[in-house]
């Protein structure tokens, strides 16, 4: 939780200049440490639906040991679902109409599978835009993950994602580009993030839209950016929520499809498998190519995987939650407390 500058100690102002959150006594008096209501618009396909829930719930739940979080999952009815997923959604998810009536403090929008080059041609496009429009006016901050970032950049800023010659896939090194922004305050200035995407929105596109880049990679491009107001829309292109095994499961899926001829044999995700893991996987691929029926060597590979991103992901989500707490209204459903400028809610210079 943030410091309160309850006297004129110069250290408070120095910490502010260094990007550390320090509240004035006036702002602190207007803060109420209440439960936070966080929506999760889960657009992921059936196979990843529940895993995505767990990943984002874990990040939010671990972000602050004091706050209490009420998570509100929902989805879009236009997304194709099988019987099992529909049953899960029917039992455990909420309707957007009910969420809209009750209000949210923060919203996370996941990625989704697509079948069209132009996102506006997807069946989920108009329902997604309805959620995005509502959130802009009624939610303190919306965090967009991967494809959701591309959708918002296209819809709100007329910046269309660009298909890349090869998939941006693996674990990539990133650097913080503005250490003073509260979203990246006190996180490692160099850290890893997994990526898994064919399309990209470039730094030039973000900047043309007035969106500030906060974290980027020389190889994978921009990971973290924020709308020009500093908080109301947060953009991820990477997948910091991924479990240690997430990229392995993607590789397994694609490699098994390759054995049937449905896909070309996939490359290894960058900077993810060590040499021993690569040897296990290469041997499996070689032997299945010549017709052997083998069990995928998951049990041998999993112990060899390292997670080099989760602690920083927790820190960034913790900063985001902290920023929301500072400015959200005491009344659920109103985005900002009195006196907060929606065009500069964090009071950034």
UniProtKB/Swiss-Prot annotation:
Pathway: Amino-acid biosynthesis; L-methionine biosynthesis via de novo pathway; O-succinyl-L-homoserine from L-homoserine: step 1/1. It catalyses: L-homoserine + succinyl-CoA = O-succinyl-L-homoserine + CoA. It is an enzyme of class 2 (transferase). One of its GO terms (cellular component) is cytoplasm. GO terms for biological process: methionine biosynthetic process. The keyword Transferase applies. Gene3D superfamilies: 3.40.50.880. The record marks 196 as: Important for substrate specificity. The active site is at 146 (acyl-thioester intermediate), 239 (proton acceptor), 241. The record marks 113, 147 as: Important for acyl-CoA specificity. Its EC number is 2.3.1.46. Substrate binds at residues 167, 196, 253. It comes from the Bacteria. This is Homoserine O-succinyltransferase. Pfam families: HTS (PF04204). Keywords: Acyltransferase, Amino-acid biosynthesis, Cytoplasm, Methionine biosynthesis, Transferase. Belongs to the MetA family. The keyword Amino-acid biosynthesis applies. Its main location: cytoplasm. It comes from Thiobacillus denitrificans (strain ATCC 25259 / T1). GO terms for molecular function: homoserine O-acetyltransferase activity; homoserine O-succinyltransferase activity.
